[in-house]
Amino acid sequence: MPENLNLCHPYCKKNTVQKWGGIGAKDTLEYYNGLTLHREFIEWNEGQGYTLIIGKKDVATARVTWQINTLSEETSELSIRIELLPDVALRRYVPWLRGLIRRFYFIPKMQHYIHNVVKGFKYYAEHETPVTKNQFGYNAMFSVK
């Protein structure tokens, strides 16, 4: 569903679609902390998930895969996998420092982020009520208190 992050994402202030549906779809995410990221969908499996690249303007900083697994007629499972492109995302840091930042800051923050985004989709599916800002906890990389 286009712009579904407006309903389900606890750190997304605004999700705007430029082009929707299939490979080549594009949208923009504006987070509560002012960060704006652009997504371009590079794989699309209707009803099963998609893969996208995300970054600032034309610079991809990560590859993200969203996958939906149907467990039963009434139950599905959402998984999100983020593959950081560290030489791009952390390029302003010297190479030896990138590994430390990735391991001790980025990965824990992103695990928290993914966990809460999945919680947002679960909440919306169960309650049909939009998720609110920081509903499942604050994340400094994407929000403000």
Label each residue range with its predicted role.
Residues 1-21, 141-145:
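Hydrophobic ligand-binding cavity/cleft-lining segments
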Residues 14, 115-145:
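Short, highly charged C-terminal tails/helix-capping segments
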Residues 25-32, 50-57:
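Short beta-strand segments that buttress and anchor functional surface loops
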Residues 32-34, 46, 83-85:
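Solvent-exposed coil/turn segments that connect beta secondary-structure elements
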Residues 33-36, 60-61:
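Short coil-to-beta-strand transition motifs
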Residues 45-50, 73:
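Short, conserved beta-turn/loop elements at beta-strand boundaries and strand-helix junctions
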Residues 56-116, 123, 132-134:
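Beta-strand/loop substructures that line and gate deep hydrophobic ligand-binding cavities in soluble
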